[in-house]
Curated annotation (Swiss-Prot):
Key word Chaperone present: no
Keyword Ribonucleoprotein in annotation: yes
HAMAP family with a match to the protein in the record: Ribosomal_bL28
Identification of the protein by name: Large ribosomal subunit protein bL28
Family: Belongs to the bacterial ribosomal protein bL28 family.
Organism of origin: Ehrlichia ruminantium (strain Gardel)
Taxonomic lineage of the native organism: Bacteria, Pseudomonadati, Pseudomonadota, Alphaproteobacteria, Rickettsiales
Length: 100
């Protein structure tokens, strides 16, 4: 079971534990992951992810799962998230053609 965010690909980071006497020892910072189900309004479908708390807060801030994916650059997204982003773009393009 890898500790990687399914949307952003965020993994553990490294740093130092600093004591009161300023002695430094190496340590790792693990990602705070949660199993969540996110709903896509455009696709009318649910997706299950294991995502970090930071990503979940960002999704809420952006206004939902669909808007988060559309506003985030593809370089910052994992392969799975990029595929869903393409599906959302395709669905919105089809909806625009139908409404015209």
């Amino acid at each position: 079971m890898s500790r990687v965010c399914d949307i952003t690909g965020q993994t553990k980071s490294f740093g130092n534990k600093v004591s009161h006497s300023n002695r430094k020892t190496k340590r790792t910072y693990l990602v705070n992951l949660h199993n969540v189900t996110l709903f896509s309004d455009v696709l009318n479908r649910k997706f299950r992810f294991k995502i970090s708390s930071r990503t979940l807060r960002t999704i809420d801030y952006k206004g939902g799962f669909d808007l988060y994916l559309l506003e985030t650059s593809s370089r910052k997204l994992s392969d799975k998230a990029q595929k869903i982003k393409k599906m959302i773009k395709k669905a919105t393009a089809e909806n625009v053609k139908v409404s015209l």
